Regions:
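Phosphate-facing sequence motifs and polybasic nucleic-acid/acidic-lipid-binding regions
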Residues: 1-206
Length: 206
């Protein structure tokens, strides 16, 4: 049949042509803030969000050798949720936040869901977006800070014997909600000791 194993075709994220310069500048800015504010490694957090597909399709199939366009069953599955993962520079993994499409708690995992109790004990946060998407919103980002990021920073400051005024550094990507004036203004007013730092656009995977 002249078939061979082929990977489904899809557009890859484009890396900026000046990515090295962007990353170097980001590194210098971060190093400066860490030095000037005496930020210890436990008080530096990196957070990232990613899509988790409920029923992941296969990326490989059999197709005619030399095919330019290859389709697979389930590869375009859109039913998914967002998971926000945070880790500190000293290796501490913070509780996860998940965001589910919908307007009520029924959109989130139920009490009888597999491993639900373990997730709750680990302080996971199950959020519904109150929108028709499962991406982060102003409200879910504020919950992330109020319930996960800020409490972690405050606990670590106490453990390290540092004053409440000690600055901490939080690195996130350039998602539109993250960089919005609304969120930045809220964070500065509500959590003035948390400094925000952005991963250059298109460089998250580097």
């Amino acid at each position: 049949l002249h078939w061979s194993e082929r990977r489904a075709t899809r557009a890859a994220q484009k890396t900026p042509t000046n990515w090295e310069d962007l990353c170097e500048r980001a590194f210098i800015r971060m190093a400066y803030r860490i030095k000037e504010e005496d930020v210890p490694s436990p008080l530096y957090i990196n957070s990232d969000q990613t899509q988790v597909v409920y029923a992941q399709g296969a990326a490989l199939t059999w197709s005619k050798t030399g095919s330019k366009q290859v389709s697979t069953v389930g590869n375009d599955e859109k039913r998914a949720f967002t998971i926000v993962v945070s880790i500190s520079c000293d290796g501490t993994v913070l509780p996860f936040q998940t965001i589910h499409q919908g307007y009520t708690k029924k959109s989130c995992p139920t009490l009888t869901s597999q491993s639900y109790d373990q997730c709750i004990k680990a302080n996971f946060r199950f959020e519904y977006s109150k929108t028709q998407t499962y991406w982060s919103t102003q409200e879910t980002m504020r919950t992330l800070v109020d319930e996960i990021i800020a409490p972690y920073f405050e606990t670590k400051k106490q453990e390290l014997g540092l004053p409440p005024t000690q600055k901490s550094l939080w690195q996130i990507d350039l998602w539109s909600v993250h960089r919005s004036d609304e969120f930045r203004t809220w964070l500065k007013k509500t959590h003035p000791t948390i400094m925000i730092d952005y991963v250059p656009g298109g460089c998250t995977g580097l």
